[in-house]
């Protein structure tokens, strides 16, 4: 919430009046592109909604704050989890799903978010495999076969939405989590 608010506050004049602050006062945003770009602001809001660590500098700030406090051994208190409401909920949900014997697919739009989810799954001792757009050929097939082979005991499969739905059969999964749906309804409908 704090970081979302900071993005808004940084661009408040633009949102309210179509103006931006300059060193010499306030000037109207011109068509030439002065002022914040809406697409960039949207992307910053999307990142913030996924996890504050996706914003530049936030992870270092949160980790420094945590180092000052007495670090708890409880995973729910780890800054990677506690700084994101989605991660707090995901920890509770995945713990319950694992205890009940479910197998889970987790989709994300961003490979950087998959990186954070991968760190989270390791921290929580959840077994997983992953594919994204950078994983090709045999490595991709091996990850799919490993997940589908129940004897391997892989609980989660991380997938990027772009790499994930094409030519993949993951019949052993019974739960799908879309960590961050696309803000474009046409893309999300696919």
What are these regions (language model features)?
Residues 1, 6-12, 20-156, 160-164:
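Conserved Helicase C-terminal RecA-like lobe
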Residues 126, 134-137, 161-190:
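Conserved RecA-like helicase motor core of SF1/SF2 enzymes
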């Amino acid at each position: 919430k704090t970081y979302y608010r900071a993005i808004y506050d940084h661009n408040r004049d633009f949102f309210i009046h179509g103006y931006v602050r300059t060193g010499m006062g306030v000037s109207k945003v011109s068509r030439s592109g002065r002022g914040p770009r809406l697409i960039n602001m949207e992307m910053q809001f999307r990142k913030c909604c996924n996890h504050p660590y996706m914003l530049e500098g936030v992870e270092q700030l949160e980790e420094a704050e945590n180092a000052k406090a007495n670090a708890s051994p409880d995973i729910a208190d780890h800054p990677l989890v506690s700084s994101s409401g989605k991660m707090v909920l995901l920890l509770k949900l995945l713990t319950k799903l694992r205890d009940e014997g479910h197998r889970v697919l987790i989709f994300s739009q961003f490979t950087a978010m998959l990186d954070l989810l991968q760190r989270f799954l390791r921290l929580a001792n959840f077994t997983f495999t992953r594919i994204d757009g950078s994983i090709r050929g045999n490595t991709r097939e091996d990850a799919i076969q490993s997940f589908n082979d129940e004897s391997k005991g892989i609980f989660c499969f991380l997938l990027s939405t772009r790499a994930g739905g094409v030519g993949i059969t993951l019949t052993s999964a019974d739960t799908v989590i879309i960590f961050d749906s696309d803000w474009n309804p046409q893309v999300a409908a696919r």
